[in-house]
Amino acid sequence: VATEADIWRTAGIIAAEYGAEGVSFAGQMALSFEIGGKVEDQKVWLSIMEKVEALTSPASEDAAQLSH
């Protein structure tokens, strides 16, 4: 079972590696688990996708620039 910290950590890695394209990557992962019938894993990847989207949104980037 993935913890909330695990999910945020994974989302951060994906956001750093792929930027906004990481949202699509996480969505594809969620879809693959849905097709495979692994509903709990799909839910984890949907959560990761939402967090990658939050981390890569323009508002998030603006806030990061203001904090430096």
Residue ranges and their predicted role:
Residues 1-32, 36, 40, 47, ...:
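Long, non-catalytic architectural segments outside compact domain cores
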